[in-house]
Amino acid sequence: MARFSDGSESYRSILYAEARKAARAQWWTGPEAITQYLDADAKGRLIQSLKSFLASRSLRSTEVLGRHYTIEELIAILLRDLRAEAERQFGVAVREARVGRPVRFVGADTEADDAYAVERLRQAFTLAGFERVEFEMEPVAAAGFYAARLQKDEVLLVGDFGGGTSDFSLLRVGPGGRELLGNDGVGLAGDTFDARLIRHVVSPELGLGSSIGSMGKRLPVPVWLYSNLERWHYLSFLRSKETLHLLKTLPGQSEEPEKLQALYDLVNEDLGYRLHQAVQRTKRELSQAESAEFRFSEGSVEIGATVRRADFEEWIADDLAAIAGCVDRLGTRQVDRVFLTGGTSFVPAVRRIFEERFGAERIESGSEFTSIAHGLALGG
């Protein structure tokens, strides 16, 4: 496995651009994008979770520092850096790739949407200089990692919980080979859980539920502002000239001006990434304790609250039901072992779905952030 500048074996799908000479953008990707963004004096453009846009036919491109880029072109920028780093570390030319893909992409309502997302991803690899690309369902790849240590065949249910999707595969694996018995998935996972925390803990302190207006006519603050705040791959959309102008006018029309001012400051000072870091810290702490202290103090924005795990589980109840539905559709009677991977598999309420159906003794996990990559390599 390659190891990157932050010491990890995973490469975050994040890009950061700043204007340089001749108005051309200079790009950083992965861990270096985060470092450059946090250290920059004049903020450029941070772009995250690009895979979440692949199934969307309405979002073909976006403007970055005066130039339009397609989603495929942006992903290709990241892939070129990743390929160059692999070539540097391993000393060989990299022209082929085995790539994990979710069972169901975020926003994909039909098989045609999924096929569209895969084709866009394939185009991105082509733009990045790859000559041959093979795709594998991510939970199937994780199954390959698990099966490498088996001495006898087992029926295995794999649950892969990423940022944007929860994916499941049922397979027969072991020395006798691998047989895929079924796939299912849903376009929600860790990012959705983060969004619930923002909606219930953060957004009320930024004016959600407040009203604005004058001359005796009051209207609620537009909810779409908070919907974009909740989804970290939409944060950059809040920084458009039109939206910033709207946000700047809201405190003067609001019954809670200090909260709307905090919302404007958060967006104008480009604090969204740090906000999501604070939310994710709280989510991780709730996996270890019955309550956690949410604290966000950046610039002029101060938010603090105690969050109870019981409340968090109530906020994500519908999401948990959707995940459980995937498991139940695949069937539970014949499963010998359950293998869980991905950061969201640490959430107690998620693990409880599997413990209630299979018993804790049949559940295993390990290499939660790299098992898919290991499985893809073993299958190559």
Give short role names for the model-derived ranges.
Residues M1-Y11, A19, A23, W28-V158, ...:
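N-terminal phosphate-binding loop and flanking beta/alpha elements of the actin-like ATPase fold
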